[in-house]
């Protein structure tokens, strides 16, 4: 079974800077230019939509920085920002991980320091699953999350509606969330041709789950620029949804996949910071349901 590496960084601008859109481009630029963990460059440039890498938006005061209204975000010199890179690779990346350094980028000059390193054996996530079999699952969307409901189309219909742009769900179902997590997990372990299984798993999870509560809201966010320099925008979801899956086998699988996505994210554009999630758990009360 593969390993997941999660590295937390402190990112301090050494001058006033205007952050790029999205702000994750600062660390992405350093990787692509070979200045930070160069072994990840091929993973970043891969066209695989479920590739095992997540680069968060920069954070300030425990909130992710992303652009919603077209206004650029200016950060003052000396501000302490945070970021996370999570990934899985066969390369010997630990030899490339430096504790700190000062880096020139096209966005300004930054002092970058490692705050934390976590290495997770995917197989051992099953131990964490068992701890939460009697809990409700709360999925919190830390950054705007882009989930296409077309993931729940039967595979026999996927090609027919391939060119229909329905946007992203701003009220995602349990099945949609866990189907995306399943796809991330399968890509991580090298399991191929999973479209039928993902569809069945999503439909079953919708049918056999119960929603305990939610606080979800849509957000329109800039995801980058087109070839003419115009902002590209998408409408995603933030907030949280809490649910339980009474069927033990199904819940065990859902927890396993969601725990993986708590490192690698879910949905579209995870490689530039969208779809960051955090799992929270609450004991099931007898009166629920």
Curated annotation (Swiss-Prot):
Keywords, sorted A to Z: Antiviral defense, Endonuclease, Hydrolase, Magnesium, Nuclease, RNA-binding
Cofactor(s) required, per the database record: Mg(2+)
Pfam families registered for this protein in UniProt: Cas6_N, CRISPR_Cas6
Domain of life: Archaea
A GO MF label: RNA binding
Enzyme nomenclature, EC number: 3.1.-.-
Top EC category: hydrolase
Regions crossing the membrane: none
InterPro entries for this protein: Cas6_N_arch (IPR041165), CRISPR-assoc_Cas6_C (IPR019267), CRISPR-assoc_prot_Cas6 (IPR010156)
GO biological process: defense response to virus
Subunit structure: Possibly part of the aCascade ribonucleoprotein complex.
Family statement: Belongs to the CRISPR-associated endoribonuclease Cas6 family.
Biological role: CRISPR (clustered regularly interspaced short palindromic repeat) is an adaptive immune system that provides protection against mobile genetic elements (viruses, transposable elements and conjugative plasmids). CRISPR clusters contain sequences complementary to antecedent mobile elements and target invading nucleic acids. CRISPR clusters are transcribed and processed into CRISPR RNA (crRNA). Functions as a ssRNA-specific endoribonuclease, generating an 8 base-long tag known as the 5' handle.
Record's protein name: CRISPR-associated endoribonuclease Cas6 2
Organism of origin: Saccharolobus solfataricus (strain ATCC 35092 / DSM 1617 / JCM 11322 / P2)
Lineage: Archaea, Thermoproteota, Thermoprotei, Sulfolobales, Sulfolobaceae
């Amino acid at each position: 079974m593969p390993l997941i590496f999660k590295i937390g960084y402190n990112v301090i601008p050494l001058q006033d800077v205007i952050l790029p859109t999205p702000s994750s481009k600062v660390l992405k630029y350093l990787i692509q230019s070979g200045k930070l963990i160069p072994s990840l460059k091929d993973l970043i440039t891969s066209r695989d939509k479920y590739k095992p890498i997540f680069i968060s938006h920069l954070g300030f005061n425990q909130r992710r920085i992303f652009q919603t209204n077209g206004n650029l975000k200016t950060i003052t010199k000396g501000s302490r920002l945070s970021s996370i890179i999570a990934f899985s690779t066969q390369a010997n990346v630990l030899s490339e991980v430096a504790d700190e350094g000062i880096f020139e980028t096209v966005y300004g000059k930054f002092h970058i320091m490692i705050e934390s390193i976590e290495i997770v054996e995917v197989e051992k996530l099953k131990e964490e699953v068992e701890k939460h079999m009697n809990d409700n699952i709360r999925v919190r969307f830390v950054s705007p999350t882009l989930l296409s409901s077309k993931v729940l189309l039967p595979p026999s219909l996927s090609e027919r509606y391939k060119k229909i742009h329905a946007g992203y769900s701003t009220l995602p179902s349990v099945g949609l969330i866990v189907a995306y997590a399943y796809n991330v997990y399968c890509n991580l372990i090298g399991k191929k041709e999973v479209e039928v299984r993902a569809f069945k798993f999503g439909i079953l999870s919708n049918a056999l789950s119960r929603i305990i509560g939610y606080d979800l809201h849509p957000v329109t966010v800039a995801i980058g620029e087109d070839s003419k320099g115009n902002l590209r925008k998408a409408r995603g979801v933030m907030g949280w949804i809490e649910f339980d899956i009474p069927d033990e086998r199904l819940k065990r699988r859902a927890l396993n996949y969601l725990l993986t996505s708590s490192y690698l994210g879910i949905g579209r554009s995870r490689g530039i910071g969208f779809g960051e999630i955090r799992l929270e758990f609450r004991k099931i009360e007898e009166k629920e349901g």
